[in-house]
Amino acid sequence: MESLHQAYTYIAQRLNIPGWDDEKVDVKKLVRLYLSKESAGQWLLVFDITDTARLETAGSSQAVSLMEYLPASDQGAIVFTTTERKTAVTLASQNIVELPPEMEQDMAQQMLEMCLISSANKPEVVDLLLKELAYLPLAIVQATAYININKITLTEYLLLLAKKKEEAAEPISTEYENVIGLTWLISFEQIRYQDMVAADYLLFMACIDPRDIPLAVLPMTLSYEKGIDAVGTLNAYSFVTKRTAESALDLHRLVHLSTHKWLKKQELLSQYNQAAITRLLEVFPDDNHWNRSKWRRLLPHAKFALLSGLSRQENNTRIALAHKLAIALFHDGRFDEAETYFDGALQSWKEVLGPEHPSTMSSIGNLALTY
């Protein structure tokens, strides 16, 4: 729900739809109505990685259908990408184009050759590597990035893959997730050896939403240059994609998943989750109207961090972030969601500080505003 809200807000702002900045207006319905009009002209909407046709609201047992927010016009078209067949049928009926996760061998070979700096490779070794990588584009990109940076041969990388496959524990989920997990692990261990700041950045990002991560949210470093170098390292290993115009980063879903699973396996998830919550609290702006674009961008990250982790043990930092999140949602006109977080913060303050504490009383007042 949060990513859809963010995307529709961006669309409404770029199209300058009247009322887009009115906190009492549901921007998702506003965009749907605008694009459904003939006067909107021709348009194309792309929903990338749509895992479900149901939109969950944090703290609520109810969900709404994505279909409620889809515009309808003879001048427009909507494209969904998804790995879930049920979702595809729900959203597109019979208008489905099935694509295998892996590439055709010839195309995969062309991609490998384009990504590699050295072109002097034996065909049989190339074929073997592609087979081990299951012809997956992301696996090919990660593997070639490692090969190029560390100046090793394809055979040496195959040996690394074999070693990590032996060391790996139980399978992650599917074959292609296992392959991505192996290429990720090889690169991540090298990053930890070469650039610990880059490794910390990646572990931090595993505890927030993987899309549109502002560079300003990343943990502080001893110097600006070290931070820039760390982002460069992650980009060189194809772990992140830069959004230059927005000064932000994106993580591929499977990179995010692999990193999150590694944290859990190493029993570090709670530690890094708490660090993410602490950092988000530091950078989350106040509810001033002029800060709206800033805190809107941080909403999905705050939500993810508060729902992530293992124990979810309540502490002042976690509760304070939930309270700030509730205030932001309230000023964004999303009163039901705000109520959920205000109520959660209130119950937590009562438990941690007692019913008469000023923070508890403040939460009671804020909760009353949502009714």
Model-predicted segments: where are they?
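Residue register of alpha-helical TPR repeats
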Residues: 320, 359-362, 369
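Aliphatic-rich helical/repeat scaffold segments used for oligomerization and domain docking
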Residues: 1-347
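A general secondary-structure boundary signal
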Residues: 69-72, 360, 371
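Canonical tetratricopeptide repeat
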Residues: 140, 361-364
